[in-house]
Amino acid sequence: MRFRISHRLDRDSLPCINAPIIIYNPRVDKNVALTPFAKAQAAVLRAVKPLPAVRLPLEQAFGFVLREHIRADRPLPPFNRSAMDGYAVRHADLAKGLRRFRCVGTLEAGAAWRGAVRPGECLKIMTGAPVPPGLDAVEQVEKSISDGPHVELFTDAPERWQHIHRMGADCKKGERLIAAGETLTPSRVAVAAAVGAARVAVTRAVRVTVVASGSELVGVAAAPAPYQIRDSNSRFLMARFFEMPWAAASFGGVIPDDPRALRRALAAALKRSDMVIVTGGVSMGERDHIPEVLKQCGVQNRLYKSAIRPGKPVWFGVKGAKAVFGLPGNPVSVAATFREFVLPALRKMAGCTAVLPSVLRLPLAAPAKKKHALREFRVSRS
């Protein structure tokens, strides 16, 4: 049976380590109802709200999400602007066949022409300079010969407004240029600067703490014993946050499978964070303490287990306006649940308009069989 995979994970972005073996506790009910994927995603998004807005200088707002529209404070361009170095003339003179003009001066960008340019006269003009009233065509300097005070132009089919970027051609005064909910990319920062938006309202940074749980984990620089593995999940997550200027992420450490140690670490993370992400310890093993510890910390569970693979044991809860995610310890599960649950929640808290990840539909390279009813995520190469 062929089926279409509508969600992809980039193999190159995943940590390549062996996942810990999960020993299931028979005392735990394995028949916890699985929430369908779409309902699980919707439950997460219903539970989170955009954070408050702050006003920042434009140069500090790159990458943040706008909370107000950016509108043009004047037409752009604000005047008829020469698009070429050349000679500004009246189109009516060209239409009559006139090609030899008396040049009355030179106008550079950043200056205004104070005199008059009468019929039969022209003005030498630089790129970016304002074209004086009454002149409505510019001929390139390459198509001219200067003869003392006179200039002869060589043009066969002159058009009105040729080589002139007309006033308001890009936008009108008051026109919305950037919508609230858009991220301030470099090009949008340039647009905001062009219309004088020196300070902008953006969602304040989402404060995130990442905690790795598991007695089998050691730091990246450590020499692991044969029964230990290096913590790659937190490195993966922290690297993802480097891509998000609107998120301020910190690492809460690697915590062993000890309820008291976990409670101390997660309580501290909750105090300083808008979102806490903990990896590992959310399944049904005897040492999977995260759900109970989070309950003791006052976190109300809103989602436990979704009908997906990998990532079925995903856990989500809230404490007031704070969001808490418990992600399964398998690295591919971390990547999948981060993309499908954590990232949309982060985007909503940051004030983004579009929060769900994009879907790219491509044909499979080979037939794939699916023997279960779960929404399945598979690693792909990009």
Predicted features along the sequence, with ranges:
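Generic structural signal for well-ordered, non-membrane alpha-helical segments
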Residues: 33, 37-41, 54, 58, ...
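Flexible glycine/proline-rich
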Residues: 54-59, 63, 68, 81, ...
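Intrinsic disorder/low-complexity segments
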Residues: 1-23
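Structural signal for hydrophobic packing residues in well-ordered secondary-structure cores
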Residues: 45-52, 69, 131, 175, ...
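Helix-rich terminal scaffold detector
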Residues: 23, 30-37, 198-327, 331-337
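Short, glycine/charged-enriched hinge/interface segments at domain edges or termini
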Residues: 23-31, 37-38, 87-256
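Short, low-complexity N-terminal leaders and the immediately following helix N-cap/first helix
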Residues: 17-98, 353-377
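Glycine-rich, charged/polar anion/phosphate-binding loops
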Residues: 69-75, 125, 162-164, 193-199, ...
